[in-house]
């Protein structure tokens, strides 16, 4: 009897924890399901492991379900990330280089891509916790390059994202001027490779 109680004492918290994580994952996915499209301005602040500010920036962020997002950093140095529903294009104008990978590779590189991805098998690779309107998404794999991504809401409005990498650097993105995307703006999710740039094609798989 005492042994049985000991097993229960160990097992019940694990069961409750597993249920809570599943529930919080469901709450986050429900909130994301309310956002079929979104466009916003962002400001970015990057701090190192000692909490020293090492970079500030700004730009435009947009997403559309399914599997489309747009990330245009305009300051201090321009860079562009476009997910067109299947492939993810990363353009560095200064280096005159474009890298392209499939969406599943991008999700493995950063859970931020989960914002527009609803595949249950992919979501099962992450734990989700919720504290005061901020959901923390952490990969279960120890090989992931990102430690966690926090996604914060004010009601159902996405307001902030915080990304922490394995080196302890933290990137905070504050969103403002959030609007839905008009039909005329959907072309932002289509990337055209500029002339005279090098292309690094890393695509491996199809999208789940």
Curated annotation (Swiss-Prot):
Tell me which positions the record assigns to the signal sequence: 1-22
> Its family?
Belongs to the LolA family.
Keywords, A to Z, come to: Chaperone, Periplasm, Protein transport, Signal, Transport
Tell me what this protein is called: Outer-membrane lipoprotein carrier protein
Instruction: State the compartments where it is located.
Output: Periplasm
Superkingdom is: Bacteria
Instruction: Name a GO CC annotation attached to this entry.
Output: outer membrane-bounded periplasmic space
**What's one GO BP annotation on this UniProt entry?**
lipoprotein localization to outer membrane
Q: How does it assemble?
A: Monomer.
Main function: Participates in the translocation of lipoproteins from the inner membrane to the outer membrane. Only forms a complex with a lipoprotein if the residue after the N-terminal Cys is not an aspartate (The Asp acts as a targeting signal to indicate that the lipoprotein should stay in the inner membrane).
InterPro entries in UniProt: LolA/LolB/LppX (IPR029046), OM_lipoprot_carrier_LolA-like (IPR004564), OM_lipoprot_carrier_LolA_Pbac (IPR018323)
Q: What is its main location?
A: periplasm
Query: Is Acetylation tagged as a keyword?
Result: no
Q: Which Pfam families match?
A: LolA
Q: Which CDD domains match?
A: LolA
């Amino acid at each position: 009897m005492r042994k049985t109680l000991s097993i229960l004492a160990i097992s019940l918290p694990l069961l409750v924890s597993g249920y809570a994580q599943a529930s919080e994952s469901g709450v986050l996915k429900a909130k994301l399901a309310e956002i079929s499209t979104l466009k916003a301005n962002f400001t970015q602040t990057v701090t190192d492991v000692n909490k020293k500010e090492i970079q500030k920036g700004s730009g435009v962020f947009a997403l559309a379900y399914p599997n489309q997002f747009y990330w245009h950093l305009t300051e201090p140095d321009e860079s562009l990330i476009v997910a067109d529903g299947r492939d993810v294009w990363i353009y560095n104008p200064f280096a005159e280089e474009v890298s392209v990978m499939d969406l599943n590779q991008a999700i493995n590189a950063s859970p931020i891509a989960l914002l527009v991805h609803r595949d249950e098998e992919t979501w099962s690779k992450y734990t989700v916790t919720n504290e005061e309107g901020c959901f923390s998404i952490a990969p279960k794999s120890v090989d992931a390059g990102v430690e966690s991504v926090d996604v914060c809401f004010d009601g159902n409005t996405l307001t902030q994202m915080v990304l922490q990498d394995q080196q302890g650097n933290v990137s905070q993105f504050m969103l403002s001027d959030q609007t839905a995307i008009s039909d005329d703006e959907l072309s932002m999710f289509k990337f055209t490779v500029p002339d005279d740039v090098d292309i690094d094609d890393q695509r491996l798989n199809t999208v789940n």
